[in-house]
């Protein structure tokens, strides 16, 4: 939804999934491409994008084309990587783009599950991305990026275990007692980097 010129609100709801049969919110964020309420400075509108909210973190590029529940439009293979670096967290990021070069820096709470227990275990997570993305000809687009994600600690970080919708590898590598809802990440490998 475009709230005003250069200000957008994004909200994504899962209608159903392997993990939850009922509707539930994936996340939402406010995106600022212009600052009309601050006099709309040209430098911001030309080079910057700011996102703030509970959102899919901008780590790597695979999350732009991954299958997310029923949305498989950008993924010709339907299933995602076996190690799926995907998570939603509460935070923000700022992206600078100029002539194909991009620099992004972000900060999040480091986890999806908020709470007040064990405050000493909860630290801020920092995310960064450097890259080059340019349409070089009508048939050729070049994109090369590198990302970093770091945290000093969290109660339960979900960088490789953040897919709450479920994998498309139904029951692969599961035993005969498995169920599609209980084992909704079947066929995936989670390295267990939860802290």
Regions found by a protein language model. Give the residues of each.
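Surface-exposed beta-loop-beta
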Residues: 114-195
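Outer membrane beta-barrel
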Residues: 1-113, 120-127, 131-138, 143, ...
